[in-house]
Amino acid sequence: MTNRASLPVLPQAPVDLIAVAVGGCEVLLAWTECGAGGLGFRIERADGIGSAGLFSEIGGVGPHVTAFCDGSVKPRTIYSYRVHAWNASGDSSPSNVVEVTTPRAGTEPPADKD
């Protein structure tokens, strides 16, 4: 009888990724975690629209954290984002891809009207 350690299965991909530009210098991302077993999330960004761009990892968050702020964006630029869950077995498939255009510098989002 052999003693084999089994690796966990790959985590499920995050869903419902959204992106909101805040002024010209930040993009806020939020998503929904699907299932357990992940050790965190990897955030990827590409310049331009859709998955035609080359995605690069720009950051990560721990398990059960479902938001990220990208403070390294430039004004008046289009970015695409996607998120992967990960664990000891590897990365999940990517989330949906979202695109966001940052406004010109100094532009603030509209205030909520009460």
Model-identified regions with their sequence ranges:
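Pro/Thr/Ser/Gly-rich low-complexity, intrinsically disordered linker/stalk tracts
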Residues: 1-37, 75, 88-114
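Recognizes extended acidic, P/S/T-rich segments that occur
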Residues: 41-76, 88-94
